[in-house]
């Protein structure tokens, strides 16, 4: 019985060491890091015989973020996508958009000093669905997918000391606003 325990513990330790070694090797050889998260928030407020007043409401908010980054030698390349969409219904009002975002970012850098990179970046931002100004006219959209859309590009420097934070300094940048809806473009709503 004692020999069985010793054999079992020995095999268990060897297996754990092998698994640990495999994990360490795979993370050390890849210059790519990937991470992301997704979240869903649901809320409801129901008021019955509530003396202080208020409105019943129900809402949801769906969000996701994903990053894939490359860092090897003198090269740094960070990429990020953020998507979010949420709706809210309060009282007798119809369902309204509470959150709406499509955001893409890429930043490439070449090392010029410790933690400093000469860099170029591009950012794109728009939304999924139409938006409305409910105080004016709740039936006429004031924004929609690609109306507006923003593209920002720039040259500058990236400071990346590690995993805690990154700072991008861009003294030379350009921002373009695209409105792919003729009515919104004719109203000069976005520049």
PLM-predicted stretches and their roles:
Residues 49-54, 89-94, 137-143, 189-191:
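Extracellular loop and loop/strand-boundary signature of outer-membrane beta-barrel proteins
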Residues 56-62, 98-102, 147-151:
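Residues that define the transmembrane beta-barrel architecture of outer-membrane proteins
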Residues 28-44, 75-77:
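Transmembrane beta-strand segments of Gram-negative outer membrane beta-barrel proteins
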Residues 36, 40-42, 62-70, 104-110, ...:
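Residues on the lipid-exposed face of transmembrane beta-strands in outer-membrane beta-barrel proteins
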Residues 170, 174-191:
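Outer-membrane beta-barrel transmembrane domain signature
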Residues 40-46, 72-74, 83-89, 124-130, ...:
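Transmembrane beta-strands of outer-membrane beta-barrel pores
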Residues 1-26:
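Bacterial Sec-dependent N-terminal signal peptides
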Residues 74-77, 115-118, 164-167:
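Repeated loop/turn-to-beta-strand initiation elements of outer-membrane beta-barrel proteins
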